[in-house]
């Protein structure tokens, strides 16, 4: 039998715990950094250099594109070249200086992804300003907090977000003095701005302010902060993560090394669809990598229902997604299959089993079944535009059944990554054609050191033969601290190691499996500790539910859950079992609840979960957990305190009912 490949090597020994600190496992590094970490490209000391050097090298390459609207209908993508974008950026920078914006001022950007978003960001980069994205999904309270906390003096804003921005007034106007619309400004908006002591400009009007003026660009250092990204914590106020130029240029060097080592290097011919929020580090660094390669970035129209149409028109080569988007793709394909009749499904399932079988034997997705790719799976590829060669999933765990399905049917590499805003995104990423990495986030990228730290209270041992513990990261991609919160910085950054709060398990091939969250642990009344995230990940593999929140507390002896069922599977079950009613009615139906609970219990037993980890009651909510009700963060992480508050009466009723049943049994 051939020896298993290992994608990491050890650089330091592990250490036993001492002085109240837990033990730590060995320090590991990517095999692609065997001869040291890659140096950033010569002359590339800042984010501005990333763009400037590409303008010099690829002036006529298409850079930013958006769909042309002709007679109210979307047409082809229309492009601005690197040189054209540079010329606008220089004008915008001159305008910023002409209205008195000083070095290291904080500049807010508020709105959905667009060419203007990137142009505003590059103008900040040119003049050494701190770019502060204002979350499109956080609402007025958080936007007001970020403007005031980071002392934002000027905001670039999407036209339809102007009214939202004004809701932060007058509190935000202590610092915010100037507003620039990505589009036009109405007379009423000008008047409203005046009442708050603000000056508001339309995009073209603001650009004219810099005409005929020339300001010297300041020298940018690697250590300079280029952006403060506020992360939406699951509790408390957002934290301002300071990202330096060095973090981003180091990350780019690591991505170049990784993709070259995996024979998937980026080129000028690559095309990217920009739809994941630029206010998140995931999309920001991907776009920086594309800009560094002189590649093209096309923007979506801002509507998730039209995303597939935009994909078909743009034909991207790299498609980045969060699991929610890929879950939708998976559910849509499953529905098409079951609606297509027995024969169609039989052919598809046979083709799937055949190709997956050969991939399990070590063949690449290209070699496993070219015939079935052409006859059966090509339609899936066409649905993503026809040119996608890599799908990269990040921000949250991707369910294994979705990942394995897409690896077979999408005719491209499906990779899962892991990173935090604090680590400048990319920290781990799985590798092309390595089926053994299914369900993991892959090995480390070649610019960080990784070690696990034991978590004794959760019985995770970083020195055990199967090493488990809190993931800790060291390297130049790490953030420079939380803005104005040195206390919080000291909590997570200890001796150069970032403590992520995520619990991981090293796999034999050097990839990392995220198994738990350090803080998501509570005790049941009988004294048993429950690692809730781990349990939710297992229940999340049940195809009959799209999302599940598990709850317990120290006054009760058992767990309960709130779930969003998979509509298609629930309706199919109802039809097969003679249960009537629409989707909303089915979610209230006791038999439907028993069915979903039964599926979860079946999975729990299959995974040999402990008795106290098995859910005893369930409530079905037809409305998915969402940001509108403040139940999720913008990266789709569950806000547990808010979920508890929202579903408190339902939870109380479930416990009352089950406890009454227990009591009646005597």
UniProtKB/Swiss-Prot annotation:
Q: For binding ATP, which residues are annotated in this chain's numbering?
A: 228-239
What is the disulfide pattern of this chain?
Answer: none
UniProt entry keywords in alphabetical sequence: ATP-binding, Fatty acid metabolism, Ligase, Lipid metabolism, Magnesium, Nucleotide-binding
Q: Where is this region: Fatty acid-binding?
A: 495-519
GO cellular component terms, alphabetically, are: Golgi apparatus
Q: Which is an annotated Pfam family here?
A: AMP-binding
EC number from the UniProt entry: 6.2.1.3
Q: What Gene3D superfamilies does this protein's entry cite?
A: N-terminal domain of ligase-like (3.40.50.12780)
The alphabetized list of GO BP terms reads: fatty acid metabolic process; indolebutyric acid metabolic process
Concerning PROSITE patterns, the annotation shows: AMP_BINDING
Reaction(s) the record says it catalyses: a long-chain fatty acid + ATP + CoA = a long-chain fatty acyl-CoA + AMP + diphosphate
| MF GO annotations | ATP binding; long-chain fatty acid-CoA ligase activity
According to its UniProt entry, the function of this protein is described as: Activation of long-chain fatty acids for both synthesis of cellular lipids, and degradation via beta-oxidation. Preferentially uses palmitate, palmitoleate, oleate and linoleate.
Q: Which family does it belong to?
A: Belongs to the ATP-dependent AMP-binding enzyme family.
UniProt protein name: Long chain acyl-CoA synthetase 4
Source species of the chain = Arabidopsis thaliana (Mouse-ear cress)
Lineage of the organism: Eukaryota, Viridiplantae, Streptophyta, Embryophyta, Tracheophyta
């Amino acid at each position: 039998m051939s020896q298993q490949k290992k994608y990491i090597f050890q650089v330091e020994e592990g250490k036993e715990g001492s002085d109240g600190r837990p033990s730590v496992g060995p320090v590991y590094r990517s095999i692609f950094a065997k001869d040291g970490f890659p140096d950033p490209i010569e002359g590339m000391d800042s984010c501005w250099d990333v763009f400037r050097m590409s303008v010099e090298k690829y002036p006529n390459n298409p850079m930013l594109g958006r769909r042309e609207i002709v007679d109210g209908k979307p047409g082809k993508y229309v492009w601005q070249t690197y040189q054209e974008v540079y010329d606008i950026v220089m004008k915008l920078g001159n305008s910023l200086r002409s209205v008195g914006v000083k070095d290291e001022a904080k500049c807010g950007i508020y709105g959905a992804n667009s060419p203007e978003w990137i142009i505003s960001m590059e103008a900040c980069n040119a003049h050494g300003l701190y770019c502060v994205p204002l979350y499109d999904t956080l609402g007025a309270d958080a936007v007001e907090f970020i403007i005031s906390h980071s002392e934002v003096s000027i905001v670039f804003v999407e036209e339809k977000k102007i009214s939202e921005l004004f809701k932060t007034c007058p509190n935000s106007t202590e610092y915010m003095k100037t507003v620039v619309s990505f589009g036009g400004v109405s007379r009423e908006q000008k008047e409203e701005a005046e009442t708050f002591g603000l000056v508001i400009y339309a995009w073209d009007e603001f650009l004219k302010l810099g005409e005929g003026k020339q300001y010297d660009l300041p020298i940018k250092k690697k250590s300079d902060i280029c952006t403060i990204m506020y992360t939406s914590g699951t509790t408390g106020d957002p934290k301002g993560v300071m990202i330096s130029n060095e973090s981003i240029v180091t990350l780019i060097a690591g991505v170049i090394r990784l993709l070259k080592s995996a024979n998937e290097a980026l080129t000028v011919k690559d095309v990217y669809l920009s739809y994941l929020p630029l206010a998140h580090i995931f999309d920001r660094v991907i776009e920086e990598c594309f800009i560094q390669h002189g590649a093209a970035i096309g923007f979506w129209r801002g509507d998730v229902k039209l995303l597939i149409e935009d994909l078909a028109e743009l034909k991207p080569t790299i498609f980045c997604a969060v699991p929610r988007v890929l879950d939708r793709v998976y559910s849509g394909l499953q529905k098409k299959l079951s609606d297509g009749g027995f024969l169609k499904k039989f052919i598809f399932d046979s083709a799937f089993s055949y190709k997956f079988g050969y991939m399990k034997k070590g063949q690449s997705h290209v070699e496993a079944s070219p015939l079935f790719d052409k006859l059966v799976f090509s339609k899936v590829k066409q649905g993503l535009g026809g040119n996608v060669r890599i799908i990269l999933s990040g921000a949250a765990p991707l369910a294994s059944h979705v990942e394995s399905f897409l690896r077979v049917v999408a005719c491209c590499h499906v990779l899962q990554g892991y990173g935090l805003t604090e680590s400048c995104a990319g920290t781990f990423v799985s590798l092309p054609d390595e089926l053994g990495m299914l369900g993991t986030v892959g090995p480390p990228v070649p610019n960080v050191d990784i070690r696990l730290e034991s978590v004794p209270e959760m019985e995770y041992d970083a020195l055990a033969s199967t090493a488990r513990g809190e993931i800790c990261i060291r390297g130049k991609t790490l953030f420079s601290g939380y803005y104005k919160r040195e206390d919080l910085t000291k909590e997570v950054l200890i001796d150069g190691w970032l403590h992520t709060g995520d619990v991981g398990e090293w796999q034999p091939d050097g990839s990392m499996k995220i198994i738990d969250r350090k803080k998501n642990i509570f005790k049941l009344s009988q004294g048993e500790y429950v690692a809730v995230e781990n349990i939710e990940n297992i229940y999340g593999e049940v195809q009959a539910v799209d999302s599940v929140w598990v709850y317990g507390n120290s006054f009760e002896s058992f767990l309960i859950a709130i779930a969003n069922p998979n509509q298609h599977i629930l309706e199919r079950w109802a039809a097969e079992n003679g249960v009537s009613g629409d989707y909303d009615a089915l979610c209230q139906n006791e038999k439907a609840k028993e069915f979903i609970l039964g599926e979860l219990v079946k999975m729990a037993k299959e995974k040999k979960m402990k008795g106290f980890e098995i859910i005893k009651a369930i409530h079905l909510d037809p409305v998915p957990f969402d940001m509108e009700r403040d139940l999720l963060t913008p990266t789709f992480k569950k806000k547990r305190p808010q979920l508890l508050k929202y579903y408190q009466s339902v939870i109380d009723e479930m416990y009352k009912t089950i406890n009454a049943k227990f009591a009646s049994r005597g």
